[in-house]
Amino acid sequence: ALRGLGKKAKLLFSWDEFDRLRKIPANVAAVRDDMEQYIGMPYVDVPNPFGPEGTYADYFETEFTSSVSAFGIEMDYRRQAQMYRGGKYAKYVLEAVAKRKQIYDILARHRTQAPTEEERDSFYPVSIYCPRCGRDTTKIVSISDDNAVAEYQCDCGHHGTFDFRTDFNCKLNWKVDWPMRWLYEGVDFEPGGKDHATVHGSYDTSKDVSREIFGYEPPLFQGYEFIGIRGTTGKMSGSSGLNLTPEALLRIYQPEVILWLYAKTEPMKAFDFCFDEGILRQYGEFDRMLARYLNGTADDMAKGIMEACLIKGRKVEPVPMNLLVQMGCVVNFDIPRLEAVLQKNGTPYSYDQFKDRLDRARYWLEACAPDQV
């Protein structure tokens, strides 16, 4: 939209692969029962649970990037393990360590529990990954007068020193890391889940850190509601294993319909990805709005929505999804027979018109549809 207005803009997608593995998602535990040993290690150092090649981070990053091209969205990617370990953030880490008591005071303003001087003295806004066990189960016990060299101990029994000028295997705490990256990248706008948008939440706290520690005016922020999943259980969540990748969604949704769901929904209103019959309703609503757009009867809102979701180089043929499900089931998805049945039904769609939806209709019917459908 910004580029359409003649603005220079880029969409930055950050892989938080340098975060610690907190718990084992259900879908990961289902294929490997030994993953708990890696809790506390960064995702980029955790082995791939689904195969012999690459890491945990590699697997999910590759899955995402290989399917996101279907949406016609251009993104710049940042891999945080490379950024931290490459020393790109070193001067900001040093600054945060030097200003650790000021950071503590900012964090304390946004907490309900009363701060203590003992806690303030022992606070450090950074976690060191242990060179012996690879985990972040370390505690800084002292710091040099110039705030450059820390002495630390790890729960695994290892003791060591860490020079923030030359050692980079560490990561700032979230509410310091986030504003640091705003400064580094020159971020102007960033959305975030509604949990980050609460009063005294991540954004409220991070914007104060941004201004008072890094001297950077924080970006405009837009909170958004969580996305639901109908036909299964729970909200989208990476740690629960219920997350849906673009690849999984594209098995039943055309990319334009996914973009349309986002474009038509206000940020703080929820919507569901439907694995039940609700998906047929969504396709129907999409087709009706598309028809209004194409025949020139759409209002400005609908026109803007459709222009945001239609993908250059693709043409959407609005063959009714419920019709493909019903008739496809009758002829066992045999294409010549399906064309003949549609002709007799007075809906003479050809294979070229319905091929983009047919496989999705079949997959949904066989893998997702409720028993009564």
Summary of predicted features, one role per range:
Residues 1-8, 67, 127, 134, ...:
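A glycine- and charged-residue-rich anion-binding loop/surface
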Residues 1-104, 206-208:
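N-terminal Rossmann-like or analogous alpha/beta NTP/dinucleotide-binding catalytic cores
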Residues 3, 62-69, 94-101, 105, ...:
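A broad, structural surface signal
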Residues 21-24, 108, 141-143, 261, ...:
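Short, solvent-exposed loop/turn and secondary-structure capping segments
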Residues 34-39, 101-105, 156, 164, ...:
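Glycine-rich loops and low-complexity Gly/Arg-rich segments
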Residues 44-60, 107-127, 131-133, 255-266, ...:
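Hydrophobic transmembrane alpha-helix bundles
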Residues 73-246:
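Active-site cores that bind ATP or allylic diphosphates and position pyrophosphate for catalysis
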Residues 198, 203, 225-372:
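Catalytic adenosine-cofactor/nucleotide-binding cores of aminoacyl-tRNA synthetases and other
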